[in-house]
Each structure stands twice: as structure tokens, then as C-alpha cells.
Amino acid sequence: MKKNNILILTALAALSFTSCGNKTNGVETDTDSLTADTTVTAAPVADIHTEEAIKDQITAYYNELNNVNDGGLDMTTLDSIACTKSLLALMEQVEEKSMKAIAQGNDEYFEDEGYRWYQGLGTPIKVQFDDITDPEQDRVEAFLTLSWNGQKGQVRLRLTVEDGQWKIDDFADYDTDGVGFRRDMESFLGINLDNPAG
């Protein structure tokens, strides 16, 4: 993926802590867009299979990401909160292989930082929700337009219900036709994408 496109994906690591309503710590939001610049306190949601619950979860992640520089959660903790267990395991394998390659002076390491890389941690990110597919299912795609520091980009965030909340399972640009961060990592690890067993 291009670094520009990764900017958009990077901010997504911070998506966990469920919240309810259209107010986040005194910051007014509407159902279509918000500026994520404060921490959202976790609150139970009666039914997570609603568009509102999905938006609240995504909003909470962005709030946490924006607070990293202000003494909030560190990125490792954020990853563990925001991502599915299978994505975390894949990220760990990629990091291990990359560290070995770097230690051996090999330049074939994984450079894509995914959702964690964007211009200026702590910079408020404006999130516009463009679409959420089938919120009544356990797997959804959320189409977002992100903007910060005068930049804009579109991202497709794939979420799965795990441990009672929506977690990031993959992320990609709008126009990648299904190819995302997960597939890039699998390719780097040499996993046969047509036949995962071989």
C-alpha cells in the first residue's frame, strides 16, 4: 500500500471502549461525523448489532488513539483492545520475522505500519461515517472518511464481534477490492493465500 493510504488505516488501532449516545465527554457529535479528541468512557450497550453501537465503538477507538500523546494508553495496549486475537497473532508473527531480518541486515522486512501510522499522534482526527454494512451480523465493514491536518482519506474497516465488542480484523482503502493489511501481512509471511494449508 502507498504510505498516503496507510495514513488513513493507521489511525484505526485505537478502536475499543464501548460508549453510548451522541455525546462524548461533553463533545457534541452528530450521527454522520465527529471530532475524536477526548477519551470515551466504556459503557455497556444493550445491543451491539446496531449502527449506533458500531459508530460508538469506532469513535471510542479514535478517541483513545488521539490521547496516546497525552498520557493515554500506549500503542501495544491499544492494539490489544482494538484488534481481534487473530489479527494480533498475525501482527506478532510479522514483527518477529521483521526483527530477525533487521538483525541479520536483511532489507526484506515488513514496512507497512497499518492503522498505527499517520501524521502526528495526538492530532484530532475528524471521522465521517459513510456506510456500515449489515450491522445485525457479527462481521461488518465500516466505510469512513478520515481527515486531519488538512489531509483526507477513505478507509474500509472490517470489524468482528469478539469478547462482546466490535474489534478490528482488517482495514483497507476503499479501492483495494478486498486486499487489506491482513493479506499484506500473510503475503509477507509466505502464507499461500489460495491454499492456506500449503
Predicted features and spans:
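Bacterial N-terminal signal peptides that target proteins for export
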Residues: 1-7
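Hydrophobic/aromatic beta-strand elements that line small-molecule binding cavities or substrate pockets
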Residues: 129, 155-161
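Short, solvent-exposed secondary-structure junction/capping segments
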Residues: 63-100
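Short, aromatic-enriched amphipathic alpha-helices that serve as compact interaction elements
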Residues: 47-70
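Low-complexity, intrinsically disordered terminal/linker segments enriched in charged
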Residues: 135-139, 143, 147-154, 170-198
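Short, low-complexity, disordered segments immediately C-terminal to signal peptides
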Residues: 21-44
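C-terminal motif of bacterial Sec signal peptides marking the signal peptidase cleavage site
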Residues: 16-19
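Surface-exposed, charged secondary-structure patches
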Residues: 86-151
